[in-house]
Amino acid sequence: QLQRFGATAFVVDLIGVLSLRELAVLLTAIMVAGRSGSAFTAEIGSMKMREEIDALKVIGLNPIGVLVFPRLVALVFALPLLTVVSDLVALAGASMVAWSYSGISPAAFVGRLRDAIDMSTYFAGLIKAPFMAMIIGIVASVEGMKVGGSAESLGRHVTASVVKAIFVVIVVDGLFAMFYAAIDF
């Protein structure tokens, strides 16, 4: 569409900024919320149904420290790494699309990308990842701990976990965008 206005030179700028600042981290967080968030809720919830959480308390272990904290730490490390992979895949895919539709060669794409973005653009998206990971882990764990004694309860809480985590991740992404605009980042 930019070709009609003679703005194909800005395709790389737009793709670079949009992918690195917003889309890659947001889509990665949504996928992690759906996959890992639901798994955390299901696992903790099934342990709650089988009274394994109560057994941990009886033997003197803190269920939060044993079950929740390790998952939270793993997500805080994994989501930024997955975001880096997502950034690279998004830019590689964008390069191929720009080449096929606009005739921008991959070498020209990379050259324009270097001119269009700097490290602050890259870090603007990467900074969000640990916060989103904490949200996903906390929401999933809280929903898992709320599970009652039935499979129906487990299913409801797994669904609620994914929906709540995705909603809060999108809200936090919007808050980051407003914060970045306020500090001119």
Each model region followed by its residue ranges:
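Membrane-interfacial helix-loop-helix connectors in multipass membrane proteins
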Residues: 1-20, 88-130, 134, 138-160, ...
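Membrane-embedded translocation segments of transport machinery
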Residues: 4-48
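Hydrophobic alpha-helical transmembrane segments of multi-pass membrane proteins
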Residues: 27-28, 33, 40, 80, ...
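Hydrophobic positions within alpha-helical transmembrane segments of bacterial inner-membrane proteins
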Residues: 30, 34-35, 43, 75, ...
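Short cytoplasmic-facing helical segments at TM-TM junctions of multi-pass membrane proteins
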Residues: 43-69, 151-154
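Hydrophobic membrane-spanning alpha-helices of multi-pass integral membrane proteins
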Residues: 59, 128-133, 164, 168-171
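Start (N-cap) of specific transmembrane helices in multi-pass transporter permeases
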Residues: 63-83, 161
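Final/C-terminal transmembrane alpha-helix of multipass membrane proteins
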Residues: 154, 162-178
